[in-house]
């Protein structure tokens, strides 16, 4: 048994904390909402994020971040991209030893183009930081909570951290593969949300399988181009954290990004869609970052750039599709 802390009480953090608790580890979750913390401790449920799921009886939660940080040397970071720096600053203030961080967030910081692992590293003092990894792949929290077979990848520059993640998470329904391409796994997990938004739009417009298949394929090409430019192994995008995550996020009604895009395709404004979602839609923020990166690095990303114009510049969805289909003739 190991002591593990999970920072974040959203759907994915809760599902992973439940797996760790099922695996007989001593798990303490941290959340800023006291009512959610009380619900986890008293009823062993988190109805807002994992409806109708009974959590393991030994799973505990706290709203005191110092208590959570001091509880364990292994810390799972499961908060939205926009909260990473502020949360890590709080962790850094109270940490008393070197910590191992495994994050499950999927995003890129706008303007700086930093990946999550880079943000975590920057916010921690060296004497409090042992290393960082990422857990990513085709995985809906709802299905993992139901113990449906799920397979993901863990990536880190540190072989020991990859092994730690594999050891603490793996069981009969949750399989973990290791990967040494930290850049590729993080980029794949972040950028697929852009394509999932676009896939939701095509479904909302009533287009069929042809359009979605083309969108996913050309979207993967965009992800690979930008990821390779940033130093990723292109083969990573053919694995679980690339095409695997892309498929599940573009085709499932569980996907927040697909749901948001679907509402946009049916005529909702971005503000209306986000308000109705009531949860973080990482693809919106990532579209902004990726559009800036494409321009900065000189990478051709027409789907991403069209989605950016739709989200932030008022481009009509039908006009956006028309523009993509009428682009200059080119080789695949």
Curated annotation (Swiss-Prot):
<dbReference type="GO" id="GO:0008654">
    <property type="term" value="P:phospholipid biosynthetic process"/>
</dbReference>
<feature type="binding site">
    <location>
        <position position="106"/>
    </location>
    <ligand>
        <name>NADPH</name>
    </ligand>
</feature>
<feature type="binding site">
    <location>
        <position position="280"/>
    </location>
    <ligand>
        <name>NADPH</name>
    </ligand>
</feature>
<dbReference type="GO" id="GO:0051287">
    <property type="term" value="F:NAD binding"/>
</dbReference>
<feature type="binding site">
    <location>
        <position position="137"/>
    </location>
    <ligand>
        <name>sn-glycerol 3-phosphate</name>
    </ligand>
</feature>
<keyword id="KW-0520">NAD</keyword>
<dbReference type="Pfam" id="PF01210">
    <property type="entry name" value="NAD_Gly3P_dh_N"/>
</dbReference>
<keyword id="KW-0444">Lipid biosynthesis</keyword>
<feature type="binding site">
    <location>
        <position position="12"/>
    </location>
    <ligand>
        <name>NADPH</name>
    </ligand>
</feature>
<feature type="binding site">
    <location>
        <position position="255"/>
    </location>
    <ligand>
        <name>sn-glycerol 3-phosphate</name>
    </ligand>
</feature>
<dbReference type="InterPro" id="IPR036291">
    <property type="entry name" value="NAD(P)-bd_dom_sf"/>
</dbReference>
<comment type="pathway">
    <text>Membrane lipid metabolism; glycerophospholipid metabolism.</text>
</comment>
<comment type="similarity">
    <text>Belongs to the NAD-dependent glycerol-3-phosphate dehydrogenase family.</text>
</comment>
<feature type="binding site">
    <location>
        <position position="257"/>
    </location>
    <ligand>
        <name>sn-glycerol 3-phosphate</name>
    </ligand>
</feature>
<keyword id="KW-0560">Oxidoreductase</keyword>
<keyword id="KW-0443">Lipid metabolism</keyword>
<feature type="binding site">
    <location>
        <position position="192"/>
    </location>
    <ligand>
        <name>sn-glycerol 3-phosphate</name>
    </ligand>
</feature>
<dbReference type="InterPro" id="IPR013328">
    <property type="entry name" value="6PGD_dom2"/>
</dbReference>
<dbReference type="InterPro" id="IPR008927">
    <property type="entry name" value="6-PGluconate_DH-like_C_sf"/>
</dbReference>
<dbReference type="GO" id="GO:0046168">
    <property type="term" value="P:glycerol-3-phosphate catabolic process"/>
</dbReference>
<dbReference type="GO" id="GO:0006650">
    <property type="term" value="P:glycerophospholipid metabolic process"/>
</dbReference>
<feature type="binding site">
    <location>
        <position position="106"/>
    </location>
    <ligand>
        <name>sn-glycerol 3-phosphate</name>
    </ligand>
</feature>
<dbReference type="GO" id="GO:0047952">
    <property type="term" value="F:glycerol-3-phosphate dehydrogenase [NAD(P)+] activity"/>
</dbReference>
<feature type="binding site">
    <location>
        <position position="32"/>
    </location>
    <ligand>
        <name>NADPH</name>
    </ligand>
</feature>
<feature type="binding site">
    <location>
        <position position="245"/>
    </location>
    <ligand>
        <name>sn-glycerol 3-phosphate</name>
    </ligand>
</feature>
<dbReference type="InterPro" id="IPR006168">
    <property type="entry name" value="G3P_DH_NAD-dep"/>
</dbReference>
<keyword id="KW-0547">Nucleotide-binding</keyword>
<feature type="active site" description="Proton acceptor">
    <location>
        <position position="192"/>
    </location>
</feature>
<feature type="binding site">
    <location>
        <position position="256"/>
    </location>
    <ligand>
        <name>NADPH</name>
    </ligand>
</feature>
<keyword id="KW-0963">Cytoplasm</keyword>
<dbReference type="InterPro" id="IPR011128">
    <property type="entry name" value="G3P_DH_NAD-dep_N"/>
</dbReference>
<dbReference type="GO" id="GO:0005829">
    <property type="term" value="C:cytosol"/>
</dbReference>
<dbReference type="Pfam" id="PF07479">
    <property type="entry name" value="NAD_Gly3P_dh_C"/>
</dbReference>
<feature type="binding site">
    <location>
        <position position="256"/>
    </location>
    <ligand>
        <name>sn-glycerol 3-phosphate</name>
    </ligand>
</feature>
<comment type="function">
    <text>Catalyzes the reduction of the glycolytic intermediate dihydroxyacetone phosphate (DHAP) to sn-glycerol 3-phosphate (G3P), the key precursor for phospholipid synthesis.</text>
</comment>
<dbReference type="InterPro" id="IPR006109">
    <property type="entry name" value="G3P_DH_NAD-dep_C"/>
</dbReference>
<feature type="binding site">
    <location>
        <position position="11"/>
    </location>
    <ligand>
        <name>NADPH</name>
    </ligand>
</feature>
<protein>
    <recommendedName>
        <fullName>Glycerol-3-phosphate dehydrogenase [NAD(P)+]</fullName>
        <ecNumber>1.1.1.94</ecNumber>
    </recommendedName>
</protein>
<keyword id="KW-0521">NADP</keyword>
<dbReference type="GO" id="GO:0005975">
    <property type="term" value="P:carbohydrate metabolic process"/>
</dbReference>
<keyword id="KW-0594">Phospholipid biosynthesis</keyword>
<feature type="binding site">
    <location>
        <position position="139"/>
    </location>
    <ligand>
        <name>sn-glycerol 3-phosphate</name>
    </ligand>
</feature>
């Amino acid at each position: 048994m190991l002591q593990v802390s999970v920072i974040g009480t959203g759907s994915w953090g809760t599902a992973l904390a439940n797996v760790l608790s099922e695996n007989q580890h001593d798990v303490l979750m941290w959340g800023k909402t006291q009512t959610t913390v009380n619900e986890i401790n008293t009823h062993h449920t988190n109805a807002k994020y994992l409806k109708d799921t009974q959590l393991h009886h030994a799973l505990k939660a706290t709203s005191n971040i110092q208590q959570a940080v001091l509880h364990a040397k292994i810390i799972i970071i499961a908060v939205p991209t926009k909260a990473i720096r502020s949360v890590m600053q709080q962790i850094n203030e109270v940490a008393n030893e070197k910590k191992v961080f495994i994050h499950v967030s999927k995003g890129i910081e706008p303007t700086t183009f930093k990946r999550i692992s880079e943000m975590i590293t920057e916010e921690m003092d060296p004497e409090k930081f042992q290393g960082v990894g990422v857990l990513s792949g085709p995985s809906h929290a709802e299905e993992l909570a139901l113990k449906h077979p799920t397979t993901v990848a863990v990536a880190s520059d540190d072989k020991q951290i990859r092994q730690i993640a594999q050891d603490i998470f793996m069981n009969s329904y949750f399989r973990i593969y290791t990967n040494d391409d930290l850049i590729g796994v993080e980029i794949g997990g972040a950028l697929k949300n852009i394509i999932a938004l676009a896939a939701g739009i095509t479904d909302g417009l009533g287009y069929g399988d042809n359009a979605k298949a083309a969108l996913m394929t050309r979207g993967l090409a965009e992800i690979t181009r930008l990821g390779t430019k940033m130093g990723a192994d292109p083969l990573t995008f053919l694995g679980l954290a690339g095409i695997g995550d892309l498929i599940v996020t573009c085709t499932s009604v569980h996907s927040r990004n697909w749901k948001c895009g679907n509402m946009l395709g049916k005529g909702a404004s971005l503000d209306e869609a986000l308000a109705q979602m009531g949860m973080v839609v990482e693809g919106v923020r990532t579209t902004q970052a990726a559009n800036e990166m494409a321009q900065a690095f000189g990478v051709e990303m027409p789907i991403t750039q069209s989605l950016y114009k739709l989200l932030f510049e008022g481009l009509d969805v039908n006009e956006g599709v028309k523009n993509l289909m009428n682009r200059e003739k080119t080789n695949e």
